[in-house]
Amino acid sequence: MKEIINKFVGLSGYQIKRVKYLYDPFQNLIKSINYFNVKSIVDVGANKGQFVNKLLKNGFKGNILSFEPLFDEHNYLKKISKKKNKWTIEERCALGKKNSNEKIYVSGNSESSSLLKILPKHTDIRPDSKIVDTQEINVKKLNNFKNKIYKLEKNILLKIDCQGSEMDVLIGANKIIKSFSCIFLEVSLVNLYQKQKLWLEIIKYLKKINFEVW
């Protein structure tokens, strides 16, 4: 069958070959950080510091400001960041489009926790993401932290990984969004959380505020 397909495709001057899987999303991010000469990172949804630790292992030496809403994870971050003089853990809070008091749904795997209720589509694929607890949390706009962000060395990357609330974080950063040279965020093709905004709506919003897909 491969020979038949190759003969057919070969009529157009192309050939299909098996190649090793070379694409590494994180290495692509590192290359982008270097390309944009990123000196500081605002890390929204730090969880247990997985993202930052990978950055540090890949040689990033700039300032990092991390936000994490979960109680245990926030305490853990404060502990491990003490050895990193350029890594600051901000007060325990969630980030959103308005200042409020909310309930965060805590998943069994921690990293799937969200201000939005998780849908069966998610838990069917990852049973460890089921809600096991809730916590009361202050939700604040990223705008509230403008003075700290303005002090960061430019260029600044904004990283958002908050399980369905990415659009709300962007809206809550509307007054300082021009401070960021680039934005790295997780988007979803399908609804995994109630009321979450999907990839196309987020991309349209980013284009509206003069960012483009890289």
Q: Which residue stretches match the model-derived regions?
A:
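SAM cofactor-binding core of SAM-dependent methyltransferases
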Residues: L22-N109, L119, L189-Q196
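Glycine-rich adenosyl-binding loop in Rossmann-like folds that engage adenosine-containing cofactors
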Residues: G96-K140, N144
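General small-molecule cofactor/ligand-binding pocket signal
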Residues: K17, I89-E91, W214
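Conserved acidic-Pro-Pro-aromatic motif
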Residues: V38-V42, F51-L56, F60-S66, E73, ...
